[in-house]
Design a protein with these regions (language model features):
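Conserved, well-structured interaction surfaces
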Residues: 141-142
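Single conserved hydrophobic/aromatic residue that forms the stacking wall/gate
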Residues: 2-13, 249
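Active-site acid/base region of carbohydrate-active enzymes
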Residues: 25, 33-67, 73, 80-132, ...
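Extracellular Ig-like/FN3 beta-sandwich strand-entry sites
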Residues: 21-23
Length: 251
């Protein structure tokens, strides 16, 4: 809601609301006698361009791709978000999906937003080594363990590196990533990860969710990413530590 100040009789008044609003309809409530000369809106968003394309012989699929690209765009501002109407915070479960989509739809300037999110996630690592999102945070600190594994793993951090070719963030965050996967997370005698509930043990929507299977899958994908980073940084001992766990027990 934006309320304009009153003006004198007969004045021509121009006003631009500086607040960022979104929605499906704009309602104007005007005093009697006010004549509207013009109504406009100014689109704002993240500094990127729609450079990707998709085309097939099915008009529905072409329209779906176009709308999907727009949906991705409106979830970008100071950070990736779930949606601007309900959740503008940087939920990393959403960001994993969105950063991967950006490579197909948007210009390279979009890469910076994902890297910013990577730094923020790791910079908010807690004293016990655990990670949580959304970050930056002031009223939230609940870890969703499986979402954090997805974030730091193959479809999160590694996808950002692989498709962008930008490895500058890897040496900055690697030690904290290693601590999370090998101190915060533990494996049992057979080499399988021990389930962690965190503060919110969410595996998927619905019922009959096999958290054991999901934990193993996401932990494996996180180790797979870490091993690639370790080899890139010349951390041979770390890579050798990862190999028997990820490739003997989890495959």
């Amino acid at each position: 809601r934006d309320v304009a100040p009153s003006r004198g009789l007969g004045d021509v008044y121009k006003r631009q609301s500086l607040g960022w609003m979104n929605g499906h309809e704009m309602l104007y409530i005007l005093p009697e006698g006010v004549k509207v000369l013009d109504v406009k809106f100014r689109e704002t968003g993240y500094n990127t361009e729609f450079t990707g394309s998709f085309s097939c012989n099915d008009p529905f699929m072409n329209e779906l791709w176009k709308r999907s690209a727009r949906t991705l765009y409106i979830t970008m501002r100071d950070n990736y978000m779930d949606c601007p109407e309900r959740e503008r915070a940087q939920w990393w479960g959403d960001e994993v999906n969105e950063l991967g989509e950006a490579f197909y739809a948007l210009s390279p300037s979009s890469h910076k937003l994902a890297v910013k999110g990577i730094y923020e996630l790791m910079n908010w690592q807690r004293a016990d080594g655990s990670l949580f999102a959304p970050v930056p945070a002031g009223n939230w600190s609940k870890e969703l363990p499986l979402q954090m594994l997805a974030s730091v793993g193959w479809y999160g951090f590694y996808t950002q590196y692989y498709y962008s070719g930008d490895s500058t963030f890897i040496p900055v965050i690697y030690d904290r990533l290693h601590r999370y996967l090998h101190e915060t997370w533990q494996v049992d005698k057979s080499g399988l990860p021990i389930e962690r509930s965190g503060e919110w043990s969410w595996g998927d929507w619905g019922e009959q969710i096999d958290m054991g299977v999901l934990t193993n899958c996401w932990y494996y994908l996180a180790l797979k990413a870490e091993k690639e980073f370790a080899l890139q940084l010349g951390k041979k001992a770390d890579a050798e530590e990862i190999t028997p766990v990820s490739y003997t027990h989890l495959t």
